From Swiss-Prot:
Its EC number is 2.4.2.4. It catalyses: thymidine + phosphate = 2-deoxy-alpha-D-ribose 1-phosphate + thymine. The keyword Transferase applies. Keywords: Glycosyltransferase, Transferase. Belongs to the thymidine/pyrimidine-nucleoside phosphorylase family. Type 2 subfamily. Disulfide bonds: none annotated. GO terms for molecular function: 1,4-alpha-oligoglucan phosphorylase activity; thymidine phosphorylase activity. One of its GO terms (cellular component) is cytosol. Signal peptide: none annotated. GO terms for biological process: pyrimidine nucleobase metabolic process; pyrimidine nucleoside metabolic process. This is Putative thymidine phosphorylase 2. The keyword Transferase applies.
């Protein structure tokens, strides 16, 4: 819609000149923001100030955005701009007429305040909050407050069930004709550990149906969707997903493109910035996606270690109890598998580097990390048994045979081809080794420092960034031997990451 096509006044449509959209190319990472000049007549007439929540309309499309004020030369008084996500949502073009008005009051904020003060919420209150979040009515500061108010055990099991249900209702829900629809998920917290694509390929080669949808990274250097995106197309529609699964029996796609529990993707974006992931949010995030995807049998991998997300067995027991309670409310069958979370799994940490590990394992090359292969075969075997595709006690052997025969690799190729084609992951421009300060034995590797180093290098936003592990616990090293190699796409990020790595040693070496 161009300015000369419609003389629509801002606000209530009386007495103000229309605002004309001017693209500025500002990326706020999915947060809707509108930019106006401080002396804009609409601001003066309506009393708008910076950080006000306003309703923005272009034609028939509208959304709620946060107001930022910017002056000349970026904007004149009769111009308005939008963040990239808001412009995309409104399909805005240069010259479009923009109308703004006061945003409607949000009744759910009362429930949010109650939760901040430690009160229990009922299902209707939680549903109202999630409904407003998924509709884009909450600014990030409100979402942050909700996440913080629910963290550290502040949400009980009944609330967690209600949260999960509200998140399922916030989007679409898939259904399948198969009695058993398998899935595999890892709670995260362990750098590398990209077993899911390998497990899906093995299990699908063994006859299971796995419409696998994955999230992007929350607090880690890569999520399964981030990693798979370096290999194939992951943003599929529901119709495309169904076609892929009907054709090859499995998928490896990003759940965010399917409108499955869309509130979860918004929460994940803010959780990533806060670097938090509470039990209640973790359970609701995982299980809402599984319910929405139509899964019936879910294997959940839980790495346990002193620097993993789940640090002790008692934490695992608490998480498993919550998972089983919520899963039972939705008729889901779950199998929790405790795995070693004392050190990173595989060599690559970061989307492209982890993708290379996946290819090496599936192609059975000499470069395949043995630990990643072993863990993947064990989990795939457990899933085959859990879903009745292998006799009890015979799953791991069956999984190993499916991998060694090349059946899993052929299935993975088929999945990627069905999703748009298989491509080779890229490589970073800059690399630098972090070396051992002295000779000795590696006695520990700090997962959190490793993950932080990889993220400072640019992962997961820069697909080729991250780090490559050169040692494992119990390895003997000499002075000056590389412990890991940092990969970055910008020299500044390389320096930043390496400075952190040197100031916060991730690899503990006991001198001889």
């Amino acid at each position: 819609m161009q300015a000369n096509e419609l003389k629509l006044a801002a606000g209530e449509g009386q007495g103000s000149e229309p605002l004309i959209f001017k693209p500025l190319g500002i990326d706020t990472w999915q947060e809707h923001v509108i930019y106006l000049h401080p002396d804009c007549p609409v601001c003066r007439a309506e009393g708008f100030t910076a950080q006000a929540r306003v309703q923005v309309r272009i034609g028939e499309a509208s959304l709620i955005a946060t107001l930022n004020l910017v002056g000349a030369p970026l904007l004149d008084t009769g111009e308005a701009s939008l963040s990239a996500s808001a412009a995309q949502a409104l399909e805005a073009r240069a010259g479009d007429v923009v109308a703004i008005s006061h945003a409607p009051a949000l009744e759910s904020v009362r429930a949010l305040r109650a939760k901040i003060y430690g009160r229990r919420l009922d299902g209707a209150q939680i549903d109202s909050i999630i409904s407003d979040i998924s509709a884009g009515r909450y600014p990030d500061v409100y979402i942050s407050a909700f996440l913080a108010a629910c963290a550290d055990g502040r949400m009980n099991r009944r609330e967690t069930v209600d949260l999960t249900r509200a998140m399922v209702h916030s989007g679409e829900r898939l259904s399948w004709s198969h009695a058993v629809v398998a899935d595999k998920h890892c709670v995260g917290g362990l750098p590398g550990n990209r077993t899911t694509p390998i497990v899906v390929a093995i299990a699908a080669a063994g006859g299971l149906v796995l419409p696998k949808t994955s999230s992007r990274a929350i607090t880690s250097p890569a999520g399964t969707a981030d990693t798979m995106e370096t290999l194939t197309r992951v943003a599929l529609s529901a119709a495309e997903l169904r076609h892929v699964v009907e054709r090859v029996g499995a998928s490896l796609v990003w759940g965010g493109a399917l409108n499955l529990s869309p509130a979860d993707d918004i929460l994940i974006r803010v959780e990533r910035a806060l670097d938090i992931d509470s039990d209640a949010q973790l359970v609701a995030s995982i299980l809402s996606k599984k319910v929405a995807a139509g899964s019936t049998h879910i294997l959940i991998d839980v790495p346990v270690g002193p620097t993993a997300k789940v640090r002790e067995d008692r934490d695992l027991e608490r998480l498993e109890a919550a998972m089983r309670h919520v899963a039972g409310a939705f008729g889901l069958h779950i199998l929790m598998v405790r795995t070693d979370g004392t050190q990173p799994l595989g060599r690559g940490i970061g989307p492209a580097l982890e993708a290379r590990d996946i290819l090496a394992v599936l192609q059975r090359t000499v470069a395949a990390p043995p630990d990643l292969r072993e863990r993947s075969v064990m989990l795939a075997g457990a899933l085959l048994e859990f879903c009745g595709a292998a006799p009890r006690g015979a799953g791991e052997k069956a999984a190993g045979q499916l991998l060694d025969s090349g059946a899993a690799w052929r299935k993975f190729q088929a999945i990627c081809e069905a999703q748009g084609g298989l491509r080779v992951p890229g490589e970073a421009i800059f690399r630098r080794d972090i070396v051992a300060p002295h000779a000795g034995k590696v006695i520990a590797i700090d997962n959190r420092h490793i993950a932080r180093t990889a993220k400072l290098a640019g992962a997961p936003m820069r697909q080729v960034a991250g780090l490559e592990m050169r040692v494992r616990v119990n390895d003997e090293v000499r002075a000056g031997q590389p412990l890991f190699t940092v990969h970055a796409q910008a020299s500044g990020e390389l320096d930043y990451s390496c400075s952190y790595a040197l100031a916060h040693p991730a690899v503990s070496i006991e001198p001889h």
